[in-house]
Amino acid sequence: MMELLSPAGGFDSLIAAVQTGADAVYMGFGAFNARRSAKNFTDEEFASAVSYCHLRGVRVFLTLNTLLTDRELAQAADALKKACAMGVDAILVQDWGLLTLAREIVPDVPLHASTQMSLFTLGGANEAA
């Protein structure tokens, strides 16, 4: 089955994606997503966006797709927990440390390898899976 996954850098683009048939949207909030130049979402806006999407049968993927330092890992984990409490359907991850941590703290939330994860071999893909 083919799925249309669209970016949502702010509420206007989220509404446009949903109204034009997106099956799912990916969006970030906070500092740990590769779309930092986009408007992105405050915590309150993110929660509203998740509700808006779910009421319309659209899934929401959180982008946590940047490389992290050891000092940033705890903050990124907090963002992950907060977004999962808001009802995100999946997480797009780049950093291997966050991938490992996410498997521990939100084991039931699907994780997706970001295109920035730099997986080039079958072995790397198997390790990420």
Task: List PLM regions with ranges.
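Non-catalytic helical/linker scaffolds that mediate oligomerization, partner binding
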Residues: 1-129
